[in-house]
Amino acid sequence: MARNFLTIALPKGKLLTDSLEALTKIGIECQEVSEESRKLVFPLEKAQAQIIICRPTDIPTFVEYGAADIGFVGKDTLLEENKDVVELLDLGFGYCRFVVAMPEEKVPPRLPDGRFDLSGLNHQRVATKFPRVAEDFFREQGMQVLPIKLHGNIELAPRVGLAEMIVDIVSTGTTLRQNKLVEIAPILEATTRLIANRVAYRMKHERINELTEKLRQLLGKAP
């Protein structure tokens, strides 16, 4: 393929629409790209590019190993997968928060500053899709926990005795409330990021930088 040809990895699911909208607004015509299609690879001849549709958790791997030159991925996934890629730009959409939550009847006491006292949670079990993020957070608090990795229904774990607490991503907090869970500590905020393969970023720097700058201008972000 030509040196300036780009393979762009986009995530299935709720981030796909926003990702396609951003690319369209900077002049990359991708009207044919649809998650409803059985296709996973969409050639974009005019743009000298192709889009591949991947599971969100796989995008850092596709980019790290060069199967994609660039990708759109949530910061939550980027932190958990911990792949060797270049993070180029915060795209701003797909906002969510990482939090620690517990059943409302088991929340720890509050400290004088209003925060919950986490010290009694040392060596407790944490149900999560993000064991790396959970361990890193509690390590920063000088604590160790036992992460239990689940792929769904995280909120169920404390109710059935699988774990004492959960680490999960939330947007509105509705699911926590419905399951009688209380947020006891914020961990971090996450949005969608533009990432690049390290070799592609050197070999196709002009093309990738041009796309990055167009997205930056679209978002109104300073360099």
UniProtKB/Swiss-Prot annotation:
Keywords annotated in UniProt: Amino-acid biosynthesis, ATP-binding, Cytoplasm, Glycosyltransferase, Histidine biosynthesis, Nucleotide-binding, Transferase
Record-level GO cellular component terms: cytoplasm
Signal peptide: none
EC annotation from Swiss-Prot or TrEMBL: 2.4.2.17
Subunit structure: Heteromultimer composed of HisG and HisZ subunits.
Known role: Catalyzes the condensation of ATP and 5-phosphoribose 1-diphosphate to form N'-(5'-phosphoribosyl)-ATP (PR-ATP). Has a crucial role in the pathway because the rate of histidine biosynthesis seems to be controlled primarily by regulation of HisG enzymatic activity.
Protein name: ATP phosphoribosyltransferase
Originating organism: Desulfitobacterium hafniense (strain Y51)
